Amino acid sequence: MYHRMAHESQPNPLLPGYSFNAYLVAGLTPILAEGPLDFFIDRPDGMKGYIINLTMKGQGQIFDGDETFFCNPGDLLLFPPKSTHFYGRSPSSDCWYHRWVYFRPRAYWADWLEWHTKSSGIGRMSLPNNQLLLEFDRLFANIEQTQRSGRRFSEELGMNLLERLLLRAMEEDPQSPQKIMDPRVIEACQFITSNLAGELRIDEVARHVCLSPSRLAHLFREQVGINILRWREDQRVIRAKLLLQTTQESIANIGRVVGYDDQLYFSRVFRKRVGVSPSDFRRRSSEINYPAAKTLPVAWGEQIPHAVSS
C-alpha cells in the first residue's frame, strides 16, 4: 500500500486543488450556461499526460481567435502532454457535456496516439453515427466506474479498458494505418509491465505469448524499436519516477517495487537514465509542483469571470 503525498487536498477532479499525479483519472463534466462549471479551462503549458475527450451533448469551444474550432456530440479530441488547453462551453450552446480520461500511456501505445487529423496539435475525429456515440459513451463510463471502484486492480483494469477505447478509435478513424502492433507483442508488453518487480526471463515471456524466444526477440525489436530488456528497464524507471512523485515510500521500497532489490544499483540505473539520483528527482519534482511560496494550481474547477488557469 502506497502512502499518497499530502499535497493532494481533495479528491474531486472537477474542483481546485486536485492533483493529477496518477496514471489514470476519468470523469464527466456537465457544463450548463451560468452554472458552477461554466468557465474556460486555461492551461497554457498543458499537463504531464494525455486527455481524451468525447462530447456527449451541446457544443464546446476549443481555443480562441484564428485557432478556434468547435466540438459537437460524437467528436473526440486528444490533447497530448504539454499542449495548450483552452476550452469551455460554446457561447452559442446552452450546455456542454463531455466525458474525459486523463492518462499517462503505456509505452507501446505510441502509434495509437498519433491521430492523423489535428488542429493546433490537438487530435480530432468524429464518430459518424449515434450507435458509435453510445458505444464510446459506454467505454468512457466503464473506465470511470472502474477507476473509481477502489478494487484491488482498479487502475490496471481501467488502463486495459482505455487500451480498448484507443484501439476502437483507431478502427473508426479512416486515416489510421491499417497495420496495428502485433497482439503478441502487446501481450508481451502487458505481461512484463504486470511483473516489473520480478526477474522474468525472455523464455518465460515467450512461453506466455506462445512464441519461441528468438521469434519474440526479433518481433519485439522490429515493432517496438528496442530489445526486451531495455524496454523493461524503461518501464521500471517510468514507474519509479511516478512513485517518487506521488508517494512517500522510501527509495529502497520503490526500488524493490520496480524490480531492484539493491538500492545502490537502483540509484545507479536511475541516475544513468534520468540524469539525477532518485532523491534529487523527488526533491526537484516537489519544488516544481508545489512551490512553497505559491498556492496549489487550479484544475478543472474554480469559477472566475473569464478563465481558469492551472
From Swiss-Prot:
Q: What organism is listed for this UniProt entry?
A: Dickeya chrysanthemi (Pectobacterium chrysanthemi)
Q: Does the keyword S-adenosyl-L-methionine apply?
A: no
Task: Return the InterPro entries for the record.
Answer: AraC-bd (IPR003313), AraC_XylS_family_regulators (IPR050204), Homeodomain-like_sf (IPR009057), HTH-like (IPR037923), HTH_AraC (IPR018060), HTH_AraC-typ_CS (IPR018062), Tscrpt_reg_AraC-type_HTH (IPR020449)
Q: How does it assemble?
A: Homodimer.
Q: State the organism's lineage.
A: Bacteria, Pseudomonadati, Pseudomonadota, Gammaproteobacteria, Enterobacterales
Could you tell me what this protein is called? Answer: Arabinose operon regulatory protein
NCBIfam families, A to Z = PRK10572.1
Q: Which residues form the HTH araC/xylS-type domain?
A: 186-284
In Pfam terms, one family for this protein is HTH_18
